[in-house]
């Protein structure tokens, strides 16, 4: 009888580095590798515990004097779009979305590059090459999909694959209790369409159709303009010291705390 058990994941701590969200703060992260047959199960457990995935690595903040990064997930079964969100949906009625295996394309990378060059020129991803992008998409041992968003053009049938330009893309993990938006990007020339909001609304729809109660949005930092959009999608839960707590928009759940 084989009594061997699967090895437990090993966790590591990064060296301190400048925080990309808060001035005069240093960040550290705890991380582990997710490979092999247990990777999907481990991804579920870690994401539910506040980790995020990047390629085959799961990480979460482990800063010594700050707890400002708060994991956020939308409660899809209770979600109802606001008036402004309904306007976004109406304005993008001609968009067609389709789900594919996690495989990169030159069209995706060209859009990704335009997005970074316009929105994140000084970010940590600003110098990513086409090979880096391919690794970001393909290096996964979990249930990952690419969702492409295109404009329908004249001549497209209802059931046809859209032939219009690629205007947005999302890299998404399917988990047992929801969808996790790993990374998304869009055409910066179409900012009036609010494509970031549209993709989140589309993920809420997809999760509902699959009977999944959550859409995971990653981290939110109060006062960060980069992350302010995440708290518009209510109701949602924030991962606090006692577990996932419902967020109403009234309490200051991101006040930095010290140990």
Curated annotation (Swiss-Prot):
Its GO CC terms are:
cytoplasm
* Superkingdom per UniProt: Bacteria
User: Which reaction(s) are listed as its catalytic activity?
Assistant: N-terminal L-glutamyl-[protein] + L-leucyl-tRNA(Leu) = N-terminal L-leucyl-L-glutamyl-[protein] + tRNA(Leu) + H(+); N-terminal L-aspartyl-[protein] + L-leucyl-tRNA(Leu) = N-terminal L-leucyl-L-aspartyl-[protein] + tRNA(Leu) + H(+)
Cite the Pfam families for this sequence.
ATE_C, ATE_N
What does the record give as EC number?
A: 2.3.2.29
Name a single GO biological process: ubiquitin-dependent protein catabolic process via the N-end rule pathway
| First and last residue of the signal peptide | none
Q: What is its main location?
A: cytoplasm
**Molecular function terms in GO for this entry?**
arginyl-tRNA--protein transferase activity; leucyl-tRNA--protein transferase activity
* Localization in the cell: Cytoplasm
Keyword set, alphabetical order: Acyltransferase, Cytoplasm, Transferase
Q: What exactly does this protein do?
A: Functions in the N-end rule pathway of protein degradation where it conjugates Leu from its aminoacyl-tRNA to the N-termini of proteins containing an N-terminal aspartate or glutamate.
Q: Which family does it belong to?
A: Belongs to the R-transferase family. Bpt subfamily.
Its protein name is Aspartate/glutamate leucyltransferase
């Amino acid at each position: 009888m084989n009594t061997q058990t699967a090895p437990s994941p090993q966790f590591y701590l990064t060296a301190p580095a400048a925080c990309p969200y808060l001035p005069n703060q240093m960040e550290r992260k705890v991380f582990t590798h997710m490979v092999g047959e247990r990777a999907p199960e481990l991804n579920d457990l870690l994401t539910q515990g506040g980790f995020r995935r990047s390629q085959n690595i799961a990480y979460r903040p482990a800063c010594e004097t700050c707890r400002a990064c708060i994991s956020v997930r939308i409660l899809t079964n209770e979600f109802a779009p606001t008036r402004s969100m309904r306007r976004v949906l109406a304005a993008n009625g001609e968009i067609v979305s389709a789900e594919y295996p996690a495989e990169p394309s030159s069209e995706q990378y060209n859009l990704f590059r335009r997005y970074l060059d316009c929105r994140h020129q000084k970010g940590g991803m600003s110098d990513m090459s086409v090979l880096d992008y391919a690794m970001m998409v393909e290096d996964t041992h979990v249930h990952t999909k690419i969702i492409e968003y295109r404009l329908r053009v004249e001549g497209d049938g209802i059931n046809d694959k859209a032939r219009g330009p690629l205007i947005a893309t999302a890299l998404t993990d399917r988990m047992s209790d929801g969808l996790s938006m790993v990374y998304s990007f869009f055409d910066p020339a179409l900012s009036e369409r609010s494509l970031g909001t549209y993709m989140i609304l589309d993920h809420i729809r997809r999760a509902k159709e699959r009977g999944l109660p959550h859409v995971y949005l990653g981290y939110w930092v109060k006062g960060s303009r980069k992350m302010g959009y995440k708290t518009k999608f209510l109701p949602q839960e924030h991962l606090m010291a006692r577990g996932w707590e419902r967020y109403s928009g009234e309490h200051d759940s991101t006040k930095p705390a010290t140990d």
